[in-house]
């Protein structure tokens, strides 16, 4: 493969004609193909997707929910995953060999997942083992690459979601004295703190300097947090909360645990995407909410609950930019290529990586 092909793979190039089609025509074609293919086609859509995509999704949920739903669907030959790359990887690992997982736009990545690559992680593990010996177990947020999941699998660790992080961190401490949590330092910190681990027992590993950030006696360290974060949830601040408290004293503040510790501590509630959705759903009419999570989801919640006053915690918030790469034109392009008997943007994880990553996934699924 030439350098040019590596830099600009043809699969990522949306044909020009899709830019000139009307929304009405694109929606009509998507409906036609869905009807024609029937059960042979399954379209999972993440909560953070645009409405123009979600309207055609056969299931809407978080990344692991969608991968599990895809895996339970044995009728579908084609799974067109409307999410980001690591989600499609998980779907590929959990589905059968004769099912094809397609990502409509290969540029739909995740900045947080990319903050922990396998070379950095192997190097960190080697250095940390010099310091702590065989006292550590790795856990990775499902928002990570297949290679990182595989690393955890072969080192006795597991995956976690924002819904089950407490259960999995508790389990980890029944296995080893110390936890290495990848790639989101905030979810790791917030979860460990909720379980009673003091902040001064937590250190941060910086993969760019290959160094441990900690001021005390390293023998006191219980949790080692990878220095990664969600670019969306990083944008919610304590100042946002102070502004809401000042201008809307009766407004409830609910945030995702990917927000930093200070924001979570200052909020009224914190929990997974499902937790946020369920909390708003069960709230009484007339209640007021400021939500600290991705903007497409916040806007959808606002539309679904006109009886409640709901705003984004950060009034200048934007959607997840990489998630937003999946749009109606790319969805239609993926479907029309399938209709022609072609396959583009196929997600296929190496068999050895899959085997080890599934170990990590199954250790979680067996316990939640």
UniProtKB/Swiss-Prot annotation:
Protein's cellular compartments: Cytoplasm
Cofactor(s) annotated in UniProt: [4Fe-4S] cluster
Tree of life domain: Bacteria
Cofactor remark from the record: Binds 1 [4Fe-4S] cluster per subunit.
Involved pathway(s): Cofactor biosynthesis; NAD(+) biosynthesis; quinolinate from iminoaspartate: step 1/1
Known EC number: 2.5.1.72
Pfam families: NadA
List of residues binding [4Fe-4S] cluster: 110, 230, 320
Binding site for iminosuccinate: 46, 63, 141-143, 162, 256-258, 273
The keyword Transferase is assigned to this record: yes
GO biological process: 'de novo' NAD biosynthetic process from L-aspartate
This protein's UniProt keywords: 4Fe-4S, Cytoplasm, Iron, Iron-sulfur, Metal-binding, Pyridine nucleotide biosynthesis, Transferase
GO MF, one example: metal ion binding
Catalytic activity annotation: iminosuccinate + dihydroxyacetone phosphate = quinolinate + phosphate + 2 H2O + H(+)
Broadest EC class assigned to this enzyme: transferase
Family: Belongs to the quinolinate synthase family. Type 3 subfamily.
Designated name of the protein: Quinolinate synthase
């Amino acid at each position: 493969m030439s350098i040019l092909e590596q830099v600009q793979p043809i699969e990522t190039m949306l044909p020009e004609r899709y830019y000139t089609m009307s929304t009405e025509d694109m929606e009509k074609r998507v409906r036609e193909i869905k009807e024609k293919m029937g059960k042979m086609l399954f379209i999972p859509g993440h909560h953070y997707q645009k409405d123009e995509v979600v309207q055609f999704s056969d299931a809407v949920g978080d990344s692991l929910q969608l991968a599990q739903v895809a895996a339970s669907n044995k009728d579908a030959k084609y799974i067109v995953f409307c999410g980001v790359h690591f989600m499609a990887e998980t779907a590929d690992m959990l589905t059968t060999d004769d099912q094809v997982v397609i990502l409509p736009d290969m540029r739909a990545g995740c900045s947080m997942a990319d903050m922990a690559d396998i070379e950095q992680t192997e190097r960190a593990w080697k250095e940390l083992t010099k310091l702590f010996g065989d006292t550590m177990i790795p856990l990775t947020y499902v928002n990570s690459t297949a290679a990182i999941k595989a690393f955890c699998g072969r080192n006795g660790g597991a995956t976690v979601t924002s819904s089950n992080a407490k259960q999995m961190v508790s389990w980890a401490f029944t296995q080893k004295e110390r936890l290495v949590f990848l790639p989101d330092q905030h979810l790791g910190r917030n979860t460990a703190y909720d379980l009673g681990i003091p902040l001064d027992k937590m250190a941060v590993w910086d993969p760019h300097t290959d160094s441990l950030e900690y001021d005390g006696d390293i023998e006191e360290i219980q949790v080692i947090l990878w220095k990664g974060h969600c670019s969306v949830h990083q944008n919610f601040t304590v100042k946002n909360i102070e502004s809401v408290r000042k201008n809307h004293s009766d407004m409830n503040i609910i945030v995702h645990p990917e927000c930093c510790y200070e924001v979570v501590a200052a909020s009224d509630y914190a929990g997974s995407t499902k937790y946020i959705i369920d909390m708003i759903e069960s709230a009484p009419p007339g209640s007021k909410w400021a939500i600290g999570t991705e903007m497409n989801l916040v806007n959808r919640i606002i539309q679904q609950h006109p009886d409640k006053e709901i705003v984004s915690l950060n009034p200048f918030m934007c959607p997840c930019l990489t998630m937003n790469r999946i749009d109606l034109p790319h969805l239609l392009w993926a479907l029309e290529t399938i209709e022609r008997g072609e396959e583009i943007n196929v997600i296929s994880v190496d068999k050895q990586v899959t085997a080890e990553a599934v170990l990590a996934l199954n250790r979680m699924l067996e316990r939640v």
